[in-house]
Each structure stands twice: as structure tokens, then as C-alpha cells.
Amino acid sequence: MTYRDFIGRLKENGKLVEIQQPVSPIFEASRIAKKTKGPVLFHNVSGSKVIMNLLGSRDELSSMLGVPKEEIIKKLSEVSPEGEVRLVPGSPTLEVIESEVDLTKLPILTHFEKDGAPYITAGIVVSEYEGVMNASIHRLMLVGKDKLAARLVPPRHTYLLHKKAAEKGETLPVAIVLGCDPTIIYATSTRVPAGKEFEYAAALRGTPVEVFECSNGIKVPHSEIILEGYIDTKERVDEGPFVDITGTYDMVRKEPVIHITRIIHRKDPIYHGILPAGPEHLLMMGVPYEPRIYRAVGEVTTVKNVVLTEGGCCYLHAVVQIEKQTEGDAKNAIMAAFAAHTSLKHVVVVDEDINIFDPNDVEFAIATRVKGDMDILTITNVRGSSLDPRGASDGTTTKVGIDATKVLIEKENFERAIIPEE
């Protein structure tokens, strides 16, 4: 399914809000996207089309994957990154070629009052060095007509490729993809073996991913917009402030500069923007960890489902549903979840009769099945998330696991009343 096909399906299903009147890229588009929550297509942001909240809910992920919402994580946990990638000679992305680079002509958004600059938030940075390729989403701060500052997180793959090239005095060629097949957007948000992002996307959608070669040799999928360039060897600038998944400002750091040398795009391209700390940002950060937790818990007990909750920024809080068979199962599940996602701060384990997508049902389990001195596991001075405002300066935190499952020998005490159907 193409990017435009997916947008068309949203429209056909009545799930796309369209804004025809002019909208400012400074705060206004973000303000509307935050209020709308669902997919919203702006037809005139500084004369350009912009879509936000494209994959902003599990309903959109369900549509993308072709499975019910409750089966998303089971599906993702079963897919291996072994799909087919095909190199093709041309692309609709080549409809317009701009050698005179001016990034300010793009509808790059300013989202919050203290943002360091306008930010590209949905750019997939594709890089390759010495035969090793990577594709991943990075926040990109506008610092000039042909320059972007990229937040490269150590020790992730783009950071390592740039480090390796810089140590040899060489620039790292990159191509920044904006607006492509949603399965590719998801695949490049997750953790797969180096260079397997496009293969994973192909496996997810069940059809090959076509790529074409940019002028700098980087191979990219068909997209709305491609920014070709390179990451400078030594040049660094202040990057930030920027709002991260907790809705608070991340710190300002010295980060590498990407020089853009050419822009190619579709006619009348649809720019993709992700609202920082918005629903799409949360899902793209969190959902890729759910299959990892699912598989890890499955090694120690019978796992039924996993969710990283919206209230926990889809990153810091998890609810794990198991089929409990022994009294140790829930605590084993807690430890497995923490091992699978080291940024996880709090985890709740529940039984099969609890709807993990309903916060009230999860709270009911905690209220009626937890005895504080027996069912709460506290682990101090362990690695946490750099995104947690309450974490220590050395990156450590305290983690809490809650066993909100029934006591097996007293199961009848926890039976929930049912009104029979007629």
C-alpha cells in the first residue's frame, strides 16, 4: 500500500479530517493536530499539504497490518525481517528535481513555544557506509537553507555509521525520506538487525519493497519527498530544545550537521509531520517494544498480550496479560518485561479477564487483587530512561512491578459477576 493509498483509505472510512483553509506552520498546525488526535490533512500550510497523526492510534496500525487491534502485537512478534527488497530504475519521487536547495520552502513545523527551531519530525534518515545500511527516524532541526542538525543517539546505528566515517575523515552520505508507505515508517521506528528495516517492512506487508538509487548512491523507497546530502565529519551545532515523548523538553546538545545537496519530490507532495509527544510519536516509540516484551515474557510464562500505555507515554509503563499457572508467574513476567525494555519504569501484570486496553479495568485489577506487602516488587538503582524527568543524573531509577493477578488457591474470591445473555 502506498502512502497516498493509505491516506485515501482513511478518507473513504471517514477517519480523515481535512482542513482547507490556510494554516500557519508556527504552532497552529500542531495545535489543531493535538485537538483532533486522529489523522488530519492540511491542504494549505504555507502553500503545501501536510498530514499529521497518520499512525496516531492502534486503529490505524490495525488497518496497516490487516489484523484486529487486539492481535497487533501477536502479529508483530511473529514477523521476521526477511522480506524482499527490489532495486528499480525509476520512481514517481523523481517528478521534480531541485538542485537549488532551500529547505525553508518546505512546510517544516514549529510545534511548541520553546522549540529551538522548526523541526522535521518524520524524516527517515537512510545512510550507508562500507556496505552497512541503516534507516531510522531522527528529529532534524532546521539550521539553514541547506542544513539540518540531527539528534544521533549513541550507540544506535546511524550514530555508529557516522562515527566510523568521521574517524576516517569521511562524510556519511544520507537520504532523508518524507512520506512513504506506513509499513516502512513503522519498520524504521523499530529495532531490527542492522540494514534490515526495508526487509522487515516487506515482511510486514507481504509484498516486496521497491527502492531506487539517489544521486549519492543511497537507496530509498518511493516517497513524497527525498532530501539528499551528507553528515559532516566535524561540524556540530546546538540542537534543541525539543519536546520528547514525556511532553517535557529534552536537553540541548552539540549534534552533527546534515548538508542537503539536492531535493527530489512528487508533484504536489504531501509532507508528513509527527507532533512531538502526540499520539503518533507515542505509538511509533512504544509499539516496537511491545513484541520484544511479548517474546521475553513468553519465555517464562504463557503471555496473552502486552501494551505500553498512553498514560505512561507509551514508553515508561506496560501492562502484561498472562495465563497464570503458578504463583511465581507474574513476578517472572515482571522481570522479563524489565529486561526486554530497559527504559520501562513500571509494569502491571494482569489475568486474562482484564482488558489491558481499558485503564479502568487495569485499575480494578490493582484495587481488588493487589496486597502491597506481597505483590509489589521494587528494584532500586537500575538503568532507566534518559527521557524520564524523575530519573537520576547518572541514568538510574527505581522500577516497580505490580502483580495484579488472582491468587490461584482463592480464585473464586475474584470471580467477576456476569449478567447472562437472554
From Swiss-Prot:
What EC number(s) has UniProt assigned to this enzyme? 4.1.1.126
A single GO molecular function term of this UniProt record: 4-hydroxybenzoate decarboxylase activity
What the protein does? Catalyzes the conversion of trans-anhydromevalonate 5-phosphate (tAHMP) into isopentenyl phosphate. Involved in the archaeal mevalonate (MVA) pathway, which provides fundamental precursors for isoprenoid biosynthesis, such as isopentenyl diphosphate (IPP) and dimethylallyl diphosphate (DMAPP).
Q: What is this protein called?
A: Anhydromevalonate phosphate decarboxylase
Identify which top EC class this enzyme belongs to.
Answer: lyase
Which reaction is catalysed here? (2E)-3-methyl-5-phosphooxypent-2-enoate + H(+) = isopentenyl phosphate + CO2
Q: Which organism is it from?
A: Methanosarcina mazei (strain ATCC BAA-159 / DSM 3647 / Goe1 / Go1 / JCM 11833 / OCM 88) (Methanosarcina frisia)
Pathway(s) of this molecule: Isoprenoid biosynthesis; isopentenyl diphosphate biosynthesis via mevalonate pathway
Q: Which residues form the active site?
A: 244
